[in-house]
């Protein structure tokens, strides 16, 4: 991956957090870097784009404290690793996702804070179908 000067400055600030998350990135000289390993579950993604998004997120955070950077990086990774809407899944894949969701510590909300599920009364459903 080749980084601009501003991206390189931000990258140097977050490289330890990236390593903690499971990335292995080494300098190749100039502004070029080699990605040697990525966190489990991110294989097959466009890693240069993912890293640029993570760097951009870190650049937007002017008060970049350790926890905030980790939260931003983890959220970016979660968004990139998410199953695209409309993707067809096998029954086993759906069952695995369902079981993983309800064994998580917060099964009600996405990383962005959006509702995953909503309980409606029968009267509310009937009203929606009118």
What is each residue range found by the language model?
Residues 1-130:
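Long, charged low-complexity intrinsically disordered regions
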